[in-house]
Structure formats: C-alpha cells, structure tokens
Swiss-Prot record:
One of its GO terms (biological process) is vasculogenesis. It is found in: Cell membrane; Cell junction, Gap junction. This is Gap junction gamma-1 protein. The gene is GJC1. One of its GO terms (molecular function) is gap junction channel activity. The chain crosses the membrane at residues 23-45, 76-95, 176-198, 229-248. A connexon is composed of a hexamer of connexins. Interacts with CNST. It comes from Bos taurus. Belongs to the connexin family. Gamma-type subfamily.
Amino acid sequence: MSWSFLTRLLEEIHNHSTFVGKIWLTVLIVFRIVLTAVGGESIYYDEQSKFVCNTEQPGCENVCYDAFAPLSHVRFWVFQIILVATPSVMYLGYAIHKIAKMEHGDADKKAARSKPYAMRWKQHRALEETEEDHEEDPMMYPEMELESEKENKDQNQSKPKHDGRRRIREDGLMKIYVLQLLARTVFEVGFLVGQYFLYGFQVHPFYVCSRLPCPHKIDCFISRPTEKTIFLLIMYGVTGLCLLLNIWEMLHLGFGTIRDSLNSKRRELEDPGAYNYPFTWNTPSAPPGYNIAVKPDQIQYTELSNAKIAYKQNKANIAQEQQYGSHEDNLPPDLETLQREIRMAQERLDLAIQAYNHQNNPHGSREKKAKVGSKAGSNKSSASSKSGDGKTSVWI
C-alpha cells in the first residue's frame, strides 16, 4: 500500500466523519498502526527464539511456547486494527459511491435544462429618462440572469461551519454512519475481552509447562518480560481510549440530532407567518392607485426658445394628468385648487409666449400684414366697410 493511497483515504474519511470520528482516526493511526509497526516489531521480534525451556526433549519447547502464546501479540493487534477499521472503510466506499451517483444525476439534470434563465422582477430605476424609443416601459421589469451564475453566487456565500454531522445528514448517510459506529464498538469490546483472556495484564518472566511430550513439569523463560508488560498495558489503554471515543461519538450524534430538532421547532414557533400566505405566480404590478407614466411624443427640435419648450412639456404633462388621473368629481378640494392655479399659470404663459414671439419676430409680422393687404385688395367691400367705420385692425 503506497502512502499516496493512504493519504487520499484519510482525506476522504476526514470529509465524511464528525470531529470525534477524526480524533478516533488520529488515535488509530498514531497509537495503533505506527506503535504496532514500530514498537511491536522491535520488542517481539525474538519472541520465539528467546523462549528457552530447561529441557532437551525434542518438541517440548515448541509445545510449551504454543501453550504460552496461542496467538502472537503483534499478530493479534494487527488483526484487531484490520477488523476495527473495516466498518469505516466500508462506510467510506458506500459514501463515495452515493455522492458520486448524486453528483452524476445533478450534472445530467443541469445538462437537460441547458442553463435556463432565472427571472426576477426589479424596479425600473429611472431608465425612462435615458431612452428615446417612443415606447411605453413598465414600472417593473424582469431581470434575467443565468442559472449557473445564481448557483455560483449561492456557493460563494459563507456557509455556517459545522462538525461534519450535518453534512452526513444532508448526504443521507446518517444511518450507515451509525451502523458502522456500532460495529466498530462491538469489535473493540470483543478484542478487549479476548486480549484479557489470552494475555491478562502482565507478561510473566517464566512459564511452567507440563504438556506432552515433556517428561515432567518444566520451566520456560521469556525475554524482556517487563518491557512487554508495559507495551501490553499501553495497548490496553489505546483500546479503551478508542472505545470511549466511539461512545462519545454516539452520544454526540444523539444529542446533536435532538438539539437540531428542537431548534427547528423553535424557529417554526417564532416565525409562524412564513407559511400562512399562499404562493402565487401572478405577475407583480404597481401598488394600487399608482398610474403608469406614459412617455409623450418626441418633440422635434426647432429654434424656439427655452420658454416655448417648457410650455409644450407642461402642456403634455397636464394632458397626461387629465387622461390618467381621477375624475374631477372625485378629486379633493386641494387638488381642484391646484388645477385652477395650473390653468391660470398656463394662460399667463400663453400670453407671455405670444408677446415674446411678437417682439422677436417683427419681420414675420410685416410679411403677414403684406399678405393680408393683398387679400384686402381682392375683397374691396370688406376693406371699405372697415375703413368707413374708422376702426384699425391689429394683426398678431
């Protein structure tokens, strides 16, 4: 097994476990795998070669060693590591398969949708002032954006940090995770009991053997019994620590699930009105009583003064108000007074513009008088009647 494969495996286990599970994984790697591989091999490498009995009977020494150690300590611990880690590895394989299947299904759905547009309604923001297309624009308009851009915005938003439990629940892996946790705990308890019945808590310096083919009771001696006893107690402690971590993780999952359910119920009680209003797909519109402003026809540019342009704009605005406004019978008194003042101001503005045009265009008035004079020559009866009355006519 290469280190790169082990590194990838550990990264995946970290991504799909709680923080207590990550602590358990650290204990498994550091105190079990490394300690067994480094310390166990160096301590127990001469376990059988240094097992010496005070007899010359052929085969007696091998029989006594088999009675002393039915299973080697190192092989027992290696077998324990493999069986305890098997549920986690199986859970990891199932989790990777399920998540990959979910991602493949989501990718197919996105490809089938072919990036549909998400629509939302937004305020107009005074775009009418810059457009000159002679068209009526609504006060509300749909804003288009790509579905992918919307998803990227959602992903960029900061998500609340959690300990991995919520991610396991969101991926639908909670039952499998609890099942592998229970299996791991059962294996820990089984190996802890088996280690006690096989080796006890101490490695004795000698062993009395009376099995056949030994002719009588003989004494066999073990190398470095104190060192092996200390290492045996360390492995007991590591097994107990892993068992406590498993129990802690089960309690963490149970209390965390209960806390999440209580928090969700509390949020529902605090915000009961979130589900009282039915959702409709009606097109949004302006508030009641709000009139859509229609653009007037574009005024052709002439050489009129600014006063004449302002007059025409005011006249168009008044026409729009009369067209889309309420009836005069339903208007309040203040609004009627305001309209009368607007009409009076309009009349004054008309007189001012006429006087301004008469003052600035005297040549045009003389041409008009000449044309009227030619008309008067053709119609002598009307001219003589006006001259006979002695009245002068003023042409504006």
